[in-house]
Amino acid sequence: VAGMIGGKAGIIVIHMGDGAGRLDPVFEALARTNIPAKTFHPTHMARTEELPQEGFRLAKLGGYMDITCDLSDPGRMPALLKEARGQGVPMERLTFSSDGQGSWSNYDAYGNLAEIGVTDVGTMYAQLVNLVRDGNMDLAEALTYFTSNAARALELYPAKGHVAPGADADLLLLGPDLELDTVIARGKMMLENGRLLVKGTYETNI
């Protein structure tokens, strides 16, 4: 109802942990109600070895599977996408995200906090480069997981997610080695020739 009132998609983002139940509540809801699968957007879907398989299942039902960028193993994310394609998963239902400066944490065998940090939003661009360089993926395909797929998932397409007449002028200009050269957001120059022109409210002069 809130989505309809606000003119938004009205989605449910599900923060996945490593619990044994995984996506069982979602599949139960789909089986017992008329809620469309596209309503559910589970994220952190590569957190465990089992979660991707459940994400593939949800994607085949019309839902979405969001993967948090992970550069700890350069071959892991390219391999995960290759596996999804091999299983016939509709690849337009898969997205990548950064967790938006969210915290990450590791715990010892007794459940005590061992370390904590921040997930940098810059991991999204780094993951894109990883898919192209380490995964030998075509840049046009790699972009979809960060652009058009995400825009469709949030029902912001066609205003967002692609370059076309009438769409928001959101553009990235890349150098020959995939270095980020220029960023344009809704027609406004944010980064030009590697020089930052616009900063956020809480950003310092770094």
Spans of model-derived segments:
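Active-site core of metal-dependent hydrolases
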Residues: V1-D108, L113-A114
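Short secondary-structure capping/turn micro-motifs that flank functional sites
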Residues: D73-G75, S148, T182
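Short Asp/Glu-rich motifs
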Residues: M77, A151, Y202
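Short low-complexity, flexible loop/linker segments enriched in glycine and/or proline
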Residues: L80-R85, L156, K188-L191
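His/Asp/Glu-enriched, well-ordered alpha-helical/loop segment
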Residues: G86-L173
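C-terminal cap of metal-dependent C-N hydrolases
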Residues: H162-I206
